[in-house]
Design a protein with these regions (language model features):
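ASCE P-loop NTPase motor core, strongest for the SF2 helicase catalytic module
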Residues: 1-166
């Protein structure tokens, strides 16, 4: 909290928005959806934000129509996982993970789901990139740059085990 991640991302969205870029997809915990909406209204009022969550969320053609009028879609990790088949078909300008430690377990349903989301750019926001084990960093980095650090097992053998031993 208080690291300025929200404001930095909003500034990026405002300054890097080039038409005809599609919308960005921002995943966050449910407790932060309202905060993202409020901060966007306050600091980036020209950004068109759509909160995609809850039982009344749009699907199918209604969602497609909304996306044409939207710069940022804010949703929760749970909603994105449930709506994955539809969200994974969209070419997002940017896929952003707020509180990216939510994917620290590479075997989790959430981590596997976000890996299927297509975006021209990927951003991970977290104030706690490694809470317990170095392998958690691999999961976040593999979302950002798939394959850059090699397989999870190679990363574990080459880096995690030696570092965590000392």
């Amino acid at each position: 909290m208080g690291l300025g991640k929200t404001l930095q991302l909003l500034a990026l969205e405002v300054t890097e928005r080039v038409e005809p870029a599609g919308p960005s997809l921002l995943l966050c915990p449910m407790s932060l959806v309202g905060n993202w909406q409020a901060e966007a209204r306050k600091f980036a009022p020209d950004l068109r934000v759509y909160a995609h969550h809850g039982p009344q969320r749009l699907r199918g053609q209604d969602l497609t129509d909304q996306l044409a009028r939207t710069d940022i879609v804010v949703t929760t990790y749970g909603t994105a996982t449930r709506d994955l088949d539809e969200l994974a078909e969209i070419d997002w300008n940017r896929v952003v993970l707020d509180e990216a430690q939510a994917i620290k377990n590479r075997h989790s349903r959430t981590a596997k789901a976000v890996g299927r989301l297509r975006g021209e750019h990927r951003v991970a926001l977290t104030g706690t990139p490694v809470e317990n084990r170095l392998g958690e960093l691999w999961s976040i980095m593999d979302f950002l740059n798939p394959g850059l650090l090699g397989s999870a097992e190679k990363f574990r053998t080459r880096y995690a085990i030696p570092v965590e031993r000392h």
